[in-house]
Amino acid sequence: ECLGKTSDGKTIYLWQRNGQEEAPLLRELGRLREIAFRAVEEGSGKRRDTDSYDDDYLHLILWDDDDLEIVGAYRFMPTAMQVEKCGVEGLYSYSLFHYDEKMQDILEHGIELGRSFIQPRYWGRRGLDYLWSGIGAYLARYPHYRYLFGPVSISGGLPPAARDLLVAFYRLWFPASHPLAASRQPYPASLPDVLAQFGGVDYVDDLTKLKSLLGNLGCGIPPLYKQYSELC
């Protein structure tokens, strides 16, 4: 299913395996996903990064008609459909989080996002923005979905001090006022000396401080963290 075209001629498709015995497209998605994740030291170590959830989930694919290449993809699933078919255990996020019973409304009217990637040769060329445009096009067709949620990772390739800073900053500025999910493997509590780096009064000041501290460590804020926090 075609969801639209970008201003520079790329095409956004929606694809699902639907029980096909042979799925060369899924194999290619897994190969490119592994390449992209290895580039930020998050690779699985396998030839292809695929799992059982790929068989059921929808895949939003950005296609380059000129290069005949997959630019990137986002995996997502209307959660009510998957829960009806497989139970809550059929959701990827459930393997990472315990759900509160109050999560039910979100599961009934939500879409789980995850496993996004842009292959390295297309980094810095609006690929992630185009994928978000595709998600927007899907929501325009199915406006009864009210929530987007899903896990986002921090690269294990970042220095421990950088990971601590990121966790402390986002816990400070984006806390869960009504927690609906709890991590099965929670990150340790932020140390006082890390929290002391941020004033907690002015978001822009603290964000500037975070960027400076990460820059001193030779890294930056992961792109998805930037996009998700801007949406908030």
Residue ranges and their predicted role:
Residues E1-K10, A196-V201:
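Short, compositionally biased low-complexity segments
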Residues G4-H59, W63-G72:
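Short amphipathic alpha-helix that is part of the acyltransferase structural core
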Residues P24, E34, S44-R47, A80-C232:
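Acyl-donor binding region in acyl/amide transferases
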Residues Y74-A80:
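Short beta->alpha transition motifs characteristic of CBS
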Residues D66, M77, F117:
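Anionic group-transfer/hydrolysis microenvironments
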